[in-house]
Amino acid sequence: MAADANNLIWIDLEMTGLEPDVDRVIEIATLVTDQELNIIGQGPVIAIHQSDEVLAAMDDWNQKHHGESGLIERVRASQVNEAEAVAQTIAFLAQYVPKGVSPMCGNSVGQDRRFLNRYMRELEDYFHYRNLDVSTVKELVKRWSPETMAGFKKQNTHQALQDIQESIAELQYYRSKVFKI
């Protein structure tokens, strides 16, 4: 498949916390859709190795959720560091989307961008500076059409691939219920 500038890159990171100055990325997943939000490619889903010290520093919420999902054990067992995760992800993305054209797509991608900027700059640079943040649409729908909110329920698995799939489904839902384009 030739890279297409109209394709969209969807990303989700799982982190040890919310502060890039002290927390680290522990999982990354990407999907590519066409402009109609049809999934056309799934990138590698990568648990990124972090030290036991980094994992032990996670707060209770992260320990609970990443422990229950099995992510902590996957991170401990992983041999992939951040640089290798970046290389694998860019190799996948380059098949579908030229560098610098796709906005960063997902939920609360501003937070993901902060971590990419800190730890995975080459991957952050692969994106356009714009974001396609489903969270923004959700906030608008909540205020302007609250009855529409009841029609979409997220599973909140806090697993990167499932979270991206839900983000795409959520935007598809809002597109069908709210946007008259």
Curated annotation (Swiss-Prot):
<feature type="active site">
    <location>
        <position position="129"/>
    </location>
</feature>
<keyword id="KW-0378">Hydrolase</keyword>
<comment type="similarity">
    <text>Belongs to the oligoribonuclease family.</text>
</comment>
<feature type="domain" description="Exonuclease">
    <location>
        <begin position="8"/>
        <end position="171"/>
    </location>
</feature>
<keyword id="KW-0963">Cytoplasm</keyword>
<dbReference type="InterPro" id="IPR022894">
    <property type="entry name" value="Oligoribonuclease"/>
</dbReference>
<dbReference type="InterPro" id="IPR036397">
    <property type="entry name" value="RNaseH_sf"/>
</dbReference>
<dbReference type="Pfam" id="PF00929">
    <property type="entry name" value="RNase_T"/>
</dbReference>
<dbReference type="InterPro" id="IPR013520">
    <property type="entry name" value="Exonuclease_RNaseT/DNA_pol3"/>
</dbReference>
<keyword id="KW-0540">Nuclease</keyword>
<dbReference type="GO" id="GO:0000175">
    <property type="term" value="F:3'-5'-RNA exonuclease activity"/>
</dbReference>
<protein>
    <recommendedName>
        <fullName>Oligoribonuclease</fullName>
        <ecNumber>3.1.15.-</ecNumber>
    </recommendedName>
</protein>
<comment type="function">
    <text>3'-to-5' exoribonuclease specific for small oligoribonucleotides.</text>
</comment>
<dbReference type="GO" id="GO:0006259">
    <property type="term" value="P:DNA metabolic process"/>
</dbReference>
<keyword id="KW-0269">Exonuclease</keyword>
<dbReference type="GO" id="GO:0003676">
    <property type="term" value="F:nucleic acid binding"/>
</dbReference>
<dbReference type="GO" id="GO:0005737">
    <property type="term" value="C:cytoplasm"/>
</dbReference>
<dbReference type="InterPro" id="IPR012337">
    <property type="entry name" value="RNaseH-like_sf"/>
</dbReference>
